[in-house]
Amino acid sequence: MDNLNRVASGPDVRTLMAEIGREARKAARTLSLASTETKNSALLAAAAAIRTKAGAIAAANAQDYAAAQAKGVAGSFLDRLKLDPSRIEAMARGIAEVAALPDPVGRVLARFERPNGLVIERVAVPLGVIGIIYESRPAVTADAGALCLKAGNAAILRGGSESLRSAALIHDCLVAGLLEAGLPAAAISRVPIADRAAVGEMLSGLNGDIDVIVPRGGKSLVARVQNEARVPVFAHLEGVVHIYIDRAADLAKATKILLNAKLRRTGVCGAAETLLVDRACAATHLAPLVKTLLDAGCAVRGDAAALEADPRVSPASEADWSAEYLDAIISVRLVDGIDGAIAHIEAYGSHHTDCIVTEDPAAADRFLAEVDSAIVMHNASTQFADGGEFGFGGEIGIATGRMHARGPVGVEQLTTFKYRVHGDGQIRP
């Protein structure tokens, strides 16, 4: 398997990917039986290796960054690609935090006894082999590899060409951790070629050797995965995130939340993209909120009321209401109370993350109950839509579907279950 991770050309893509799949399946069987101590040892060794190689990772990332910059890619893309010393340390710390999490494998989720004396247990087990397809985020290599390992799953990582140098070094650190703990290197495999045909092979399921696909990237990548995958997918297509300012909102609190939700990092999927303001508080809240955004360097595209609130506002088009900007841009609209906010979110949202700012508990309860998103918030920045912030030790992605996993996908969501039935000679009449 080591040779596969060094190959740049040679065997055709289908043959290469089939071998990666077979080796990952073998490794998954080993991982499913690995002890908590063994998995944690591998994770801690990987974290230590990343710290040791931090300088080399930063240098490789600088090359990736310069190459992407020369191509003229968007600022939000560059932000996701960048690994400075603090982000590299955060990556190592994140792996160690995953090691400190409770082992999700082997948990008894339910236990009951039947009238005939059978004792039935529902027990958490690994999913198997997880394929992760990602673009500009080299840190996904560490996050995804660590989370899959903790949950007893093998991982097949296919990063984008833009982060190839960074991802290769991070992957080397993960493999070093595996080998130090006596686990197979194929437990965390990296697709060593940039050929897009490799993605197609992964989406086919590699002859049954991939159990789940997780895409991390732009809309076109996620759409392709969702349309073409022949195995289950954990994903979200877009993060059209709303903040609704209710008539009972505290203006100072709303301002603080809004600025953080929009501008802390504009390129993350939890960044706010649309501000909805209750018409009942527009006279006191709309202009100050819009001014604060504009003064902070955020472009505002708004409806007629927002245009009147500040001459720097540009008119919003219909497309703006469903736009995921991933930039310092926000759309602003007045709505008729909580009914209007919920209706707007239902019409234009992406079921990712939405927030209400209010001091009215009844309004908050209704919003949290009726907005059909994976994450709904009350009086908190939407940038908390993150597995690490949820205490999951990071995330492999955020899922907005309804099957199996929804919201941040952490170690618990990377397991399924089986039933263990204990008897004492019972036969069925």
Curated annotation (Swiss-Prot):
Keyword list, A-Z: Amino-acid biosynthesis, Cytoplasm, NADP, Oxidoreductase, Proline biosynthesis
Family statement: Belongs to the gamma-glutamyl phosphate reductase family.
Pfam family, one: Aldedh
GO CC, any one term: cytoplasm
Name of the protein described by the UniProt record: Gamma-glutamyl phosphate reductase
Pathway: Amino-acid biosynthesis; L-proline biosynthesis; L-glutamate 5-semialdehyde from L-glutamate: step 2/2
Alphabetical list of PANTHER family matching this protein: DELTA-1-PYRROLINE-5-CARBOXYLATE SYNTHASE, GLUTAMATE SEMIALDEHYDE DEHYDROGENASE
Enzyme Commission designation: 1.2.1.41
Catalytic reaction list: L-glutamate 5-semialdehyde + phosphate + NADP(+) = L-glutamyl 5-phosphate + NADPH + H(+)
Location, primary (coarse class): cytoplasm
Annotated function: Catalyzes the NADPH-dependent reduction of L-glutamate 5-phosphate into L-glutamate 5-semialdehyde and phosphate. The product spontaneously undergoes cyclization to form 1-pyrroline-5-carboxylate.
Keyword NADP: yes
Gene Ontology MF: a single term: glutamate-5-semialdehyde dehydrogenase activity
InterPro entries: Ald_DH/histidinol_DH (IPR016161), Ald_DH_C (IPR016163), Ald_DH_N (IPR016162), Aldehyde_DH_dom (IPR015590), G-glutamylP_reductase_CS (IPR020593), Glu-5-SA_DH (IPR012134), GPR_dom (IPR000965)
Signal peptide from the UniProt entry: none
Localization (cell): Cytoplasm
GO process annotations (BP): L-proline biosynthetic process
Gene: proA
